[in-house]
């Protein structure tokens, strides 16, 4: 990194910019635009030595440029587009831009709560005028058994920002007439200053000036002196016009600087996460403000004719793929463009899909049935994920079509990731919205072309189902590469006439030669074989909804690795056998030789043996071949005996892969969760991620639940989570069925009624839907079947769906064990609901707090619009819609609670291979103790991630999380805290303020803050994480044992011994519930609790707890185990002199906690959570100071035990032969922590 000097045309006239020689000049431009002294510049170029610098070259390519070189910023004339962008930017800079309302980004999209949490803002209600009690520490009043506080995930009300201008908008005189456009007029603006003066401004190619127009008179030419204000930047012009502007703008900047930049940074390469729970319409946070420019923004962004939105997406995708990839910089530029292009396309496709779903776009084939209609909008081709033309009639109709398009986007993502030269895919996005599934694809040239008679529409693969099969020699090489990467076997298929065709891929995977000469691969929903184990296990079960149940790509890869491992073992065994035979032969020959000769050859013989051993370590796997035939079990009929034999072999291999899933992968996952070897999932999303990573399809939730139940108490939490996920998924399918053909104005009524029948059945066992009959009359073809749903029918429907989809039978009283809030959250996420926050009554006992259901809080709600219309069905004449004095019937949800529904987007964006390679290389270097090289590579990976993805992206959030862990392990705590803080904010904004990843990020941040000496801040983060945990899971999550222990240790560090003791006791309660009273895990916590009790001067209880720990260790591990001996030693000492020991324990604790870079190892055998004392072995070795009256050896060993020292690891971890504490497994590795695999 070097500095260059930038000479400016205005104050401050010169700035220093830190740059990298690998950066493009446009990145340097962006850096200048974002600096406080230069952000008014938008239309400019840079010059060096009087020569203009091209924006699209690397800085290193600029002639004679070096460190401290001077670059000159030269203002350019504006174009109309640049003028519009300048106005938008200045509006945002001066705080004049209101919230945008669009179809894609919902309420509070991309929300971050970090700044509010870090400031320690309390959520407890305090009456107006009362001051909140100053807390000693964040956990002082925390109740672990209290119900969750919904305000935890809501944005806090912020103080109003300083106002810089009253309004800035397009003038009523805009756009300029033709004759003035030719004279350089671009836009006409209207600015009202804080002083109340209104100014008409002309945007000219040369800059901005105040004109002589008024609201009634058009005169867009400059005012005469002395009021002839003009400037190149609108920001500068406004500061000339408004005396108060500079002061208010400075105050606005100071206010913005208090926030972390990442919390307000705009999204560029990803779609922001929409929270499921949002403030109600009455909240100041979401109040709708008057803003004339909001309706003008589309014009400002896209221009008057909207032509800038019309992009040739397909050509952009394919030409980007064809960019050079020889050098590293080529690859960076290519991947960066690819990432941006996919982000833009996903955004455009999602917006278009929403318009199609709402009926805003006219179909190309209006005479066809609704499901068969196709649409083109913004150069994107849209169709419904339904079987409108009978393509999937034999596979399951609409259900099969819905699954197929979902699998297609996964397949497209896999092909995009492989990035095979010469093979192209159309841009593909699947959007679920209002019960409909829509597919958006870029238009492949020639796909709509009418072919000559006798020519097929498709050039390679099945043309009309499987009856006609096309072949094309040009597709063989690229499909061969694709199939090799996806482990797909070249195999024969037969058309309807029995003719054989040898295909590289599935008959369902099609190749199309576009009119642009490129080879496209389409329909990638069958790149893996059918799951024959699932389809053949249908006996005794309801018929599955479709025949599209295929294996996951992850499973195929795992199976390939498993078989390769077997192959390597077999090869090694062969070599060992061959070596033994050779040795025998040599021994026989040696008997006939002279002893001296034997001695003379002994040394070379040893060298030879070493060479053989070395050779054994290297097994050539090029001879290993494993590929699966994706078309077996799908109706293909081999013709000859040879073909039948080959087909039978293919079927056998696929059965073997399916069996691997059933008999090995699934049981191993259950065992790993039982043993605590993987992070325990917290909600449906994290559970699904874990299953998919292991190659397990979601349809196996029922099987997993049965295996989990068989494991008993230890996996009770997992069983409940699996059942909850089955229930929420079944509800999603049912809701989608009712929403699919329902007119959109009734969506809120439908959703609220279904939720009342499901989650509010105890409050009202016979809820009635609220429907405006007059509005209903104008939709005679709408499907209003949801009206007939009752709690009983819905319960039966859910049970039926679970039987069909997951082959699992719920217990008769399953509804009594539901976690209502968690289910509401899961359902909302799966359907894209945004619900207005309030206290929902799920049980009769909660009704007391609300005598009747809440009335709409918004003054512009539906009943005001239709107050005089017919009464709603199910409501009497005293309905609050008509007579405000009377309550509605008591129900849990009302239509006004459903504030919005957002589209759910599945995209095919590939990850950056270059950034991942750099990260992996860095990890390996650090593991090999090459710290400097490793850190350099990791920083390079971070730079690549940020360049390619932009800062706000889930992949960048994961990297920040991983890097923070790596820096913590290498004892660079400040860097670890900074990266962990970034990880929290980016995770909140891209994955959700209450996602499982967000909780992990907050917990890690708390550990790093504590290690850096900021224990009070650490406790604030722990409190927030625990509140989030309550919302997404409830209490007593298996991982919470570790967090509670960490909190207890932090409180000990603050010398809050009574509070610390409470947290150890809470941890013990959860541990006993999960692992039983007599488990080693419980004994480990009892040991720590005894310490805490001694510190709290409760000597009697300390002795009792230590005795309990000793007895468990003795029974479970025997008298000779180190843990038993330590517990016995401490028990004796505590018993001999309890008071004295308490005093000495205090001294020990003081010495231990002064070393803030460590804390107890808290995994206690439950799960691989990031441990506070990760580098404890290195730091505890020096703790040799002796304590009076205690055996120093015992004390040091105890320190190692409770801090996670290497010798005193958790007993069960010894039995499991796990890695030493210096290389611990990290919690959440399934999602977002360091993985070295």
UniProtKB/Swiss-Prot annotation:
Stretches assigned to the Clu domain: 291-535
Keywords of this entry: Cytoplasm, Repeat, TPR repeat
Signal peptide start-end: none
Localization (cell): Cytoplasm
Domain of life: Eukaryota
Bias (Basic and acidic residues) ranges: 575-597, 845-854
A GO cellular-component term linked to this record: cytoplasm
Biased composition (Polar residues): 1156-1187
Chief localization: cytoplasm
Start-end of each TPR repeat: 957-990, 999-1032, 1041-1074
Disordered: region residues: 575-614, 845-886, 1152-1189, 1201-1237
Matches recorded under PROSITE patterns: CLU, TPR
GO molecular function: mRNA binding
Entry-linked InterPro entries: CLU-central, CLU_dom, CLU_N, CLU_prot, GSKIP_dom_sf, TPR-like_helical_dom_sf, TPR_rpt
GO BP annotations listed: intracellular distribution of mitochondria; mitochondrion organization
Self-association and partners: May associate with the eukaryotic translation initiation factor 3 (eIF-3) complex.
Family statement: Belongs to the CLU family.
Reported function: mRNA-binding protein involved in proper cytoplasmic distribution of mitochondria.
Protein name in UniProt: Clustered mitochondria protein homolog
Protein source organism: Ajellomyces capsulatus (strain NAm1 / WU24) (Darling's disease fungus)
């Amino acid at each position: 990194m070097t500095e260059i000097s930038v000479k400016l045309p205005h104050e401050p006239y010169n700035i220093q910019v830190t740059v990298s020689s690998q950066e493009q000049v446009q990145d340097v431009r962006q850096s200048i635009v974002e600096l406080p002294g230069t952000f008014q510049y938008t239309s400019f170029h840079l010059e060096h030595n009087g020569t203009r610098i091209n924006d699209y070259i690397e800085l290193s390519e600029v002639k004679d440029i070096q460190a401290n070189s001077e670059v000159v910023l030269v203002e350019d004339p504006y174009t109309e587009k640049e003028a519009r962008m300048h106005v938008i930017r200045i509006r945002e800079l001066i705080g004049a831009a209101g919230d945008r309302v669009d179809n894609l980004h919902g309420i509070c999209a991309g929300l971050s709560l970090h700044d509010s949490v870090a400031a320690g803002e309390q959520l407890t209600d305090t009456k107006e005028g009362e001051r909140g009690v100053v807390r000693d520490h964040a956990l002082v009043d925390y109740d672990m058994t209290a119900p969750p506080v919904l305000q935890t995930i809501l944005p806090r009300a912020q103080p109003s920002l300083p106002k810089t201008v009253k309004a800035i908008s397009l003038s009523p005189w805009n756009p300029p007439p033709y004759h003035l456009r030719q004279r350089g007029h671009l836009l006409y603006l209207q600015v009202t200053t804080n002083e109340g003066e209104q100014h008409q401004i002309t945007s000219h190619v040369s800059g901005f000036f105040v004109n002589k127009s008024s609201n009634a008179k058009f005169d867009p030419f400059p005012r005469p002196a002395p009021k002839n204000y003009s400037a190149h930047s609108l920001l500068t012009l406004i500061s000339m016009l408004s005396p108060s502007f500079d002061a208010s703008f400075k105050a606005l900047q100071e206010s913005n600087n208090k926030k972390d930049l990442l919390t307000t940074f705009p999204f560029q390469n990803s779609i922001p996460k929409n929270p499921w729970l949002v403030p109600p319409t009455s909240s100041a946070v979401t109040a709708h403000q008057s803003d004339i420019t909001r309706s003008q923004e589309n014009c400002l962004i896209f221009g008057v004719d909207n032509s800038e939105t019309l992009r040739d997406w397909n050509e952009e995708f394919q030409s980007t793929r064809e960019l050079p990839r020889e050098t590293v910089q080529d690859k960076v530029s290519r991947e960066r463009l690819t990432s941006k292009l996919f982000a833009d396309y996903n955004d455009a496709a999602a917006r278009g899909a929403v318009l199609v779903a709402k009926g805003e776009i006219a179909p190309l084939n209006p005479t066809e049935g609704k499901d068969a209609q196709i649409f083109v909008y913004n150069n994107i081709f849209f169709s419904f994920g339904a079987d409108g033309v009978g393509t999937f009639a034999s596979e399951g109709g609409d259900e099969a079509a819905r699954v197929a398009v979902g699998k297609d986007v996964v397949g497209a993502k896999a092909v995009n990731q492989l990035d095979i030269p010469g093979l192209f895919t159309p841009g593909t996005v699947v959007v679920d919205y209002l019960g409909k599934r829509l597919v958006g694809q870029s238009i492949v040239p020639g796909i709509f072309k009418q072919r000559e008679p006798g020519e097929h529409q498709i050039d390679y693969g099945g043309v009309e189902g499987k009856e006609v099969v096309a072949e094309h020699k040009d597709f063989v090489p690229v499909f061969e590469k694709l199939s090799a990467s996806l482990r797909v076997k070249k195999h024969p298929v037969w058309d309807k006439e029995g003719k054989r065709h040898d295909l590289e891929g599935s008959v369902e995977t099609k190749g199309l030669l576009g009119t642009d000469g490129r080879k496209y691969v389409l329909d990638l929903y069958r790149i893996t074989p059918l799951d024959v184990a699932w389809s053949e296990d249908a006996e005794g079960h309801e018929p599955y909804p479709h025949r599209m149940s295929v294996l996951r790509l992850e499973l195929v890869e795992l199976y390939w690795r498993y078989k390769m491992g077997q192959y390597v073992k077999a090869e090694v065994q062969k070599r060992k056998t061959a070596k033994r035979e050779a040795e025998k032969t040599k021994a026989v020959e040696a008997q006939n030789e002279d002893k001296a000769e034997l001695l003379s050859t002994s040394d070379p013989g040893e060298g030879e043996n070493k060479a053989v051993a070395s050779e054994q370590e290297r097994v050539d796997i090029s001879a290993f071949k494993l590929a699966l035939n994706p078309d077996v079990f799908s109706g293909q009929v081999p013709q000859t005996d040879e073909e039948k034999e080959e087909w039978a072999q293919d079927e056998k291999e696929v059965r073997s892969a399916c069996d691997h899933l059933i008999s090995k992968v699934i049981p191993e996952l259950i065992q790993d969760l039982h043993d605590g070897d993987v992070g325990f999932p917290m909600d449906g999303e994290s559970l699904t991620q874990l299953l998919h990573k292991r190659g397990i399809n979601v349809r196996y939730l029922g099987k997993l639940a049965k295996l989990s139940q068989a494991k008993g108490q230890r996996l009770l939490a997992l069983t409940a989570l699996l059942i909850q996920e089955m229930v929420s998924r079944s509800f999603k399918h049912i809701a989608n069925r009712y929403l699919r053909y329902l007119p959109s104005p009734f969506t809120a009524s439908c959703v609220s009624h279904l939720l009342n029948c499901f989650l509010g059945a105890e409050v009202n066992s016979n809820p009635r839907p609220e429907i405006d009959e007059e509005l209903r009359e104008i939709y005679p073809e709408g499907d209003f079947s949801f009206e007939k749903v009752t709690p009983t029918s819905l319960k039966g429907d859910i049970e039926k769906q679970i039987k069909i989809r997951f082959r699992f039978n719920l217990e008769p009283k399953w509804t009594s064990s539901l976690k209502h809030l968690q289910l509401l959250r899961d359902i909302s996420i799966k359907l894209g609901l945004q619900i207005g926050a309030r206290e929902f009554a799920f049980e009769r006992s909660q009704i007391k707090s609300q005598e009747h259901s809440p009335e709409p809080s918004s003054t512009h709600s539906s009943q005001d619009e239709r107050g005089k219309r017919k009464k709603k069905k199910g409501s009497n004449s005293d309905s609050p819609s008509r007579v405000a004095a009377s309550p509605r019937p008591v129900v849990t949800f009302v239509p006004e609670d459903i504030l919005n529904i957002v589209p759910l987007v599945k995209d095919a964006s590939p990850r950056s291979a270059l950034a991942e390679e750099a990260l992996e290389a860095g990890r390996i270097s650090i593991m090999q103790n090459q710290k400097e090289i490793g850190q350099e590579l990791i920083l390079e990976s971070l730079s690549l991630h940020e360049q390619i993805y932009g800062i706000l992206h889930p992949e960048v959030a994961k990297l920040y999380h991983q890097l923070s862990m790596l820096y913590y392990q290498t004892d660079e705590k400040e860097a670890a805290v900074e990266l962990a803080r970034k990880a929290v904010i980016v995770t909140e904004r891209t994955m959700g303020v209450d996602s499982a990843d967000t909780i992990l990020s907050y917990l890690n941040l708390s550990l790093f803050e504590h290690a850096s000496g900021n224990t009070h801040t650490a406790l604030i983060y722990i409190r927030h994480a625990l509140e989030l945990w309550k919302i997404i899971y409830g209490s007593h999550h298996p991982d919470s044992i570790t967090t509670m222990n960490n909190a207890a240790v932090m409180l000990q560090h603050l010398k809050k011994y009574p509070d610390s003791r409470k947290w150890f006791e809470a941890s013990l309660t959860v541990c006993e519930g999960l692992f039983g009273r007599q488990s080693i895990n419980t004994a480990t916590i009892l040991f720590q609790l005894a310490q805490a009790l001694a510190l709290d001067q409760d000597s009697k209880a300390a002795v009792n707890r230590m005795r309990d720990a000793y007895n468990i260790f003795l029974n479970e591990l025997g008298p000779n185990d180190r843990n038993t001996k330590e517990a016995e030693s401490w028990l004796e000492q505590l018993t001999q002199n309890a008071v004295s020991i308490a005093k000495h324990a205090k001294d020990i604790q003081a010495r231990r906690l002064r070393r803030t870079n460590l804390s107890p190892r808290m995994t206690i055998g439950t799960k691989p959570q990031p441990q506070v004392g990760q580098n404890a072995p290195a730091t505890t070795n020096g703790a040799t100071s002796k304590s009076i009256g205690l055996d120093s050896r015992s004390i040091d060993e105890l320190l190692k035990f409770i801090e996670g020292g290497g010798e005193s690891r958790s007993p069960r971890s010894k039995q499991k032969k796990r890695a030493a504490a210096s290389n611990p497994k990290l919690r959440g590795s399934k999602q977002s922590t360091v993985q070295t695999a």
